[in-house]
Amino acid sequence: MERGMTDRRHFLKASLLGASASALAWAGRLAAKQVESAPAFAGSRVVSTWDFGVAANKAAWTVLSNGGHALDAVETGVQVPESDLKNHSVGKAGYPDRDGHVSLDASIMDADGNCGAVAALEHIEHPICIARLVMDRTPHVLLVGEGALQFALAQGFKRQELLTPESDKAWHEWLKTARYQPTANSEVRDYGHGSAIGMPGGAGNHDTIGMLAIDAQGRLAGACTTSGMAWKMRGRVGDSPIIGAGLYVDGEVGAATSTGVGEEVIRNAGSFLVVELMRQGRSPQEACKEAVLRIIRRRPAQTKELQVGFLAMNKRGEVGAWAIQHGFSYAVCDEKKQDVLIPSQSVYTTSFS
């Protein structure tokens, strides 16, 4: 009798587990089918983070509007802020680490999962170009530090000093107090849309340009580049060059990028999470919001004083964004809109601009 009861319990348990597994598999197939059946976007579009994304988008649009590849468009586009001497969170004018060294991070990815990245790269103005070459000319995904510099020089890039007089002055001002605290939405000061707080760059600077594009053939691509946190510890690397954190692209679904305090994005594999949420049927906006809320749920106290924002675009060309703090914005460029800057929704409404 007891053995019969045990057998029945095992049978019922196995049946329930089997039913649950079948239901989960069915839900997964349904979500995948919804993604596969969604119509592709007819046209080209490029989106990017922050105010400086407007100029970057225009450069990318010159590629897209002439029938170019989305991958070439994003590489071209983000080179604009990399060369912009007003921009202290990306490229050659970026603020240095606490030892006075300017180090740059970047990543690039296409719809087929091909990707390349560099981190802690010094003396090269355009890290995004080196990331592209890592993708195209090596079997690797990520090169860092001295090895990344050696590779860049071997590819014909010229070594140059990236510490500008303005950045050097700001660094020496910081050394007087040597206190590091990231400031939310720090890039806004450099582009005249917010009030200056303290010295140039404030107490810290941690913002990034992330760019996503879809071309006329429906191909998706993304790029992300930054000089990272101002006054960071030497060797610190944030989310921007980490595939799945600062950037992720899947041609079956869409693409996502992030900005803000990279450590929080890395802890949650943020951009990968956004793309997977879109795969499950969420809109870009909904996916970005859920990724932000997940960061907040894990670290509720810390996130009240820092910024993280996500920007996403699915393969239908639909765009969405969400941030922890008020002040994050993104730029959109397509055949109808050439220089549109859109404020993102946020969890908290306190303005840090």
Write out the residue ranges for each language-model feature.
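Proteins synthesized as precursors that undergo proteolytic processing into mature forms
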Residues: 38-188, 194, 198-321, 325-327, ...
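Well-ordered, non-transmembrane segments within structured domains
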Residues: 7-12, 32, 221-228
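N-terminal secretory signal peptides and thylakoid transit peptides that target proteins
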Residues: 2-19
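Assembly/interface hotspot detector across virion components, adhesins/toxins, and nucleic-acid enzymes
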Residues: 329-331
